[in-house]
């Protein structure tokens, strides 16, 4: 099982310099980006990477771009968030249809341990499992803060008797 998790973990850890920061350094966004990148420059970078902006929307006063086509194992979608045309958050959404709950748990545990090695003990921000009608919803989240920047690691699952949806996301944020 862990052999299949390690390629995902390696890809996640290579996603950007945020995992290589030490001490109280600012957490940097993935893909060698910088906080405050302009939306114009991001559009050019995404075009150069042959990625597609599949949707643009407004989320809580921020412009959000749903992007597909960034090459990374298991990465289904990346969401870039802008305020005033400047990058303030990057959300990496990982999904693999052939993974069960145990594989997601193992992957999340490995990522959490790596983050703790870099940034110390994370803060548990959510751990709940509760029904919503005939759907059982699970939400587990951890957060690490450094110098007005943060990483959140979130697992979400919704399971009914006939369907299941699972996703793991890593949110890089600046405040």
Q: Language model features by range: what are they?
A:
Residues 1-9:
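Bacterial N-terminal signal peptides that target proteins for export
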Residues 4, 14, 26-27:
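Compositionally biased, intrinsically disordered/low-complexity regions enriched for serine, proline
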Residues 6, 76, 86-88, 138, ...:
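Residues at beta-strand starts and edge strands
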Residues 8-17:
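Bacterial N-terminal signal peptides
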Residues 23-61, 94-175:
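Non-cytosolic coordination micro-motifs
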Residues 65-109:
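Mid-chain, structured segments of secreted extracytoplasmic proteins
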């Amino acid at each position: 099982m862990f052999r299949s998790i390690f390629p995902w973990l390696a890809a996640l850890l290579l996603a950007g310099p945020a995992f290589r920061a030490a001490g109280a350094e600012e957490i940097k966004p993935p893909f060698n980006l910088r906080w405050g990148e302009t939306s114009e420059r991001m559009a050019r970078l995404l075009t150069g990477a042959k990625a597609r902006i599949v949707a643009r929307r407004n989320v809580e006063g921020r412009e959000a771009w749903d992007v597909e086509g960034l090459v990374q194992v298991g990465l289904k979608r990346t969401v870039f968030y802008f305020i005033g045309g400047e990058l303030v958050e990057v959300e990496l959404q990982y999904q693999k249809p052939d993974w069960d709950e145990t594989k997601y748990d193992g992957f999340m545990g490995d990522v959490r341990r790596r983050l703790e090695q870099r940034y110390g003990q994370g803060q548990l921000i959510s751990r709940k499992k509760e029904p919503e009608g005939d759907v059982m919803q699970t939400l587990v989240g951890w957060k690490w803060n450094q110098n007005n920047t943060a990483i959140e690691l979130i697992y979400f699952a919704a399971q009914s008797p006939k369907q299941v949806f699972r996703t793991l996301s890593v949110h890089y944020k600046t405040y």
